[in-house]
């Protein structure tokens, strides 16, 4: 297989949803249908002691939520699929955002009873901004929920995107019979003891079956005929531009509708796309020269070995283990001898990868999020990955002063992962951490204790707003007021931490010469 054929066989996507919509369950069932795992149903293991393949961190297993982005790779038909299971908890939207910079499409999971929820909307907007094609899986049809038309209208009105239902449900909850596939005009029954049924062109059942006397069946046929009469054909170009989402109904927990979705996904999802550089060069996935960028760093995937893995998206060319690459930020060459692929916490050595693949590089502290690696004589760098402005700030210190070495090592590694942001006061060198949500601090505290054996003391600093400074040379000591703290971030850039919006406006009006700005 040549490079072009290899690249065209790659499909790389992230799954986005509100917590508890069934995102991790769908991830696991996709792995099950691909043959990547032998046992389905290992999600939601709080009582059984089983844990989702993608939820590998101890805190995730204990709390039943995803707080890191897991990467899983598997083969299906003639395709190699890279799937990223993103954090479902809203406090980890920063990590999710960076993950969405590394994929070519997204799958949006919606709970049929709840419809569009806040986290779904937030993540959808990121996808829309990037023009990422979005597939929709409406989950939990075996429970009572909103009517199909109501759900489609909600998606279109709330998200401002056209919908195209690929299948249609017959009933829901206890009366859920199955789904009608629009293309094949077949009915896939929910219960295993039932056989597949067929409809003719007039939507009449070809077999004799008691379902014809069921009001849920009659309603589904009437609704489907209305959809068909609307006459809108599936528009693949609209999908690829992010203006239309194909919609699939099913139940991930019951393994129902998942394989239909997977079959359609590999047919319609885009192959790896081109990427823009800071130099305004478009790098094609078919370029012979290797390039890639780091979008995530994870410490202690194996706590026994205190390892650090940098997650890299291959953008162009072919990666070969042992090759020499240049880290553009430092302009230093390095030989990559340790590279890995993932099935959550299961890792195996990668000798070869092409555009679209996500691989892990063992990191001794060389990499930062957003780093570009290139082969050959290339000199470009990919655009920086966005950072969120924190909204909660805490002073942090080690409870035991004898643990300072472990404390600083833990801070350094966890900050480099990008899940929490680091600041230091100018004169006292007090460490202040910033986060977009409270859960990040809880996870930070948990990981410091369990991975670095350090108990930490955290104290709120009473500041809610961070603003960076365009013209640092004009900052003076008199600007450090009782309602603001002047600190440096991990890059030694000056940052004001303000008490509230009023304090921010007061500062801007009093010191007109200072230009403040925020991150995302």
Swiss-Prot record:
Localization per Swiss-Prot or TrEMBL: Cytoplasm
Chain's role: Increases the formation of ribosomal termination complexes and stimulates activities of RF-1 and RF-2. It binds guanine nucleotides and has strong preference for UGA stop codons. It may interact directly with the ribosome. The stimulation of RF-1 and RF-2 is significantly reduced by GTP and GDP, but not by GMP.
Residues noted as binding GTP in the record, renumbered to the chain: 17-24, 85-89, 139-142
Chief localization: cytoplasm
Gene Ontology cellular component annotations, sorted alphabetically: cytosol
Keyword Transcription regulation part of the UniProt annotation: no
Record family assignment: Belongs to the TRAFAC class translation factor GTPase superfamily. Classic translation factor GTPase family. PrfC subfamily.
Name of the protein: Peptide chain release factor 3
GO biological process, one term: regulation of translational termination
NCBIfam families on file: prfC, PRK00741.1, small_GTP
Domain named tr-type G: residues: 8-277
CDD domains the UniProt entry points to: RF3, RF3_III
Recorded superkingdom: Bacteria
Pfam families: EF-G_D2, GTP_EFTU, RF3_C
Organism per entry: Staphylococcus aureus (strain JH9)
Gene Ontology MF: a single term: GTPase activity
Keywords: Cytoplasm, GTP-binding, Nucleotide-binding, Protein biosynthesis
InterPro entries given in the database record: EF-G-like_DII, EFG_III/V, G_TR_CS, P-loop_NTPase, PrfC, RF3_C, RF3_dom_3_sf, RF3_GTP-bd
């Amino acid at each position: 297989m040549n490079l072009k054929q290899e690249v065209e066989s790659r499909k790389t996507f992230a799954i986005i949803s509100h917590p508890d919509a069934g995102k991790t369950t769908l991830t696991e069932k996709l792995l099950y249908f691909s043959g990547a795992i032998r046992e389905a149903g290992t999600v939601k293991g709080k009582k059984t002691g089983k844990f989702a393949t993608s939820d590998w961190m101890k805190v995730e297993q204990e709390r039943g939520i995803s707080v890191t982005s897991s990467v899983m790779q598997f083969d299906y038909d003639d395709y190699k699929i890279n799937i990223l299971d993103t954090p479902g908890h809203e406090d980890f939207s920063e990590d999710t955002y960076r993950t969405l910079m590394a994929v070519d499409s997204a799958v949006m999971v919606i709970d049929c009873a709840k419809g569009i929820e806040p986290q779904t909307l937030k993540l959808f907007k990121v996808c829309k901004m990037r023009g990422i094609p979005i597939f929709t899986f409406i989950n939990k049809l075996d429970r009572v929920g909103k009517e199909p038309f109501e759900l489609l209208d909600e998606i279109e009105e709330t998200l401002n995107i056209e919908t195209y239902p690929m299948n249609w449900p017959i009933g829901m909850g206890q009366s859920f019979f199955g789904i009608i596939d629009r293309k094949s005009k077949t009915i896939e029954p929910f219960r295993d003891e039932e056989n597949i049924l067929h409809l003719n062109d007039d939507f009449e059942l070809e077999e004799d079956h008691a379902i014809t006397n069921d009001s849920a069946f009659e309603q589904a046929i009437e609704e489907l005929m209305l959809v068909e009469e609307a006459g809108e054909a599936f528009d693949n170009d609209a999908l690829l531009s992010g203006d239309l989402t194909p919609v699939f109904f099913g139940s991930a927990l019951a393994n129902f509708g998942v394989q239909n979705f997977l079959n359609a996904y590999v047919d319609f999802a885009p192959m790896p796309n081109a990427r823009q550089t800071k130099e305004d060069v478009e790098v094609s996935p078919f370029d012979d020269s290797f390039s890639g960028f780091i979008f995530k760093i994870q410490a202690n995937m194996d706590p026994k070995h205190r390892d650090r893995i940098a997650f890299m998206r291959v953008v162009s060319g072919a990666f070969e283990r042992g090759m020499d690459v240049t880290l553009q930020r430092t302009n230093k060459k390095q030989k990559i001898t340790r590279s890995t692929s993932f099935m959550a916490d299961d890792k195996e050595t990668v000798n070869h990868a092409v555009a679209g693949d996500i691989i892990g590089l063992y990191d001794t502290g060389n990499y930062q999020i957003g780093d570009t690696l290139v082969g050959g004589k290339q000199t470009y760098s990919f655009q920086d990955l966005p950072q969120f402005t924190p909204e909660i700030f805490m002073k942090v210190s080690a409870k035991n002063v004898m643990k300072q070495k472990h404390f600083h090592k833990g801070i350094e590694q966890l900050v480099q992962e990008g899940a929490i942001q680091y600041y230091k006061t100018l004169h006292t060198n007090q460490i202040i951490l910033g986060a977009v949500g409270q859960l990040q601090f809880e996870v930070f505290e948990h990981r410091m204790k369990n991975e670095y054996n350090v108990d930490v003391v955290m104290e709120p600093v009473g500041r809610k707003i961070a603003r960076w400074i365009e013209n640092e040379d004009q900052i003076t000591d008199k600007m450090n007021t009782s309602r603001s703290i002047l600190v440096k971030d991990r890059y030694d850039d000056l940052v004001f931490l303000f008490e509230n919006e009023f304090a921010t406006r007061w500062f801007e009006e009093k010191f007109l010469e200072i230009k403040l700005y925020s991150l995302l």
